[in-house]
Amino acid sequence: MQPCYYIIESQTSAKLPASIREATAADFERTAREHWQTDWRTDFIQDALLEKYALELDTTKELVGLAAYRDMPKGVLVYVEYMESAPSGNPTLSKTRKYAGIGAALLAFGIQLPIDYGYGGAIYLKAKTTQLREHYMRNYGAIPFSRFDPFLLLIDGDAARELFGRYLKEV
């Protein structure tokens, strides 16, 4: 079994094959030039301890998402520091999204990282809004991780296996 990432074309519901690779300085420049919600050139995101990855369509190499992950070996998990869809797939920036499933693919890759590190597949993240918190809980099985911060969520166990499993294929 091997991860085979994809996103969904909103108009046709077709699964479009996508790849995840290390993000580059050119990717970060595009976030400013193409008016992404966040400028990925900031010191916060450019923290050397963050692993930054880009999600792009296999056929066109169109950049559709970026994510920054923090390896947390003492906690035996990975923290999803930040992730974002390109404007064409970001519901905050586009009334009609060209693509869906970008966040799911980036979260699944986040689960792949601790598996690759030998930890299992636990990730945690902080939802930016109540709406996103409910979305992560409803669609990805996230559970509250802290009684002090209801926006801090954990995706582990069956929920992590189910989400990552969506992208596994025999090759």
Spell out what each predicted region is.
Residues 1-97, 105, 112-124, 128-131, ...:
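Non-catalytic substrate-recognition and accessory regions of acyl/acetyltransferase enzymes
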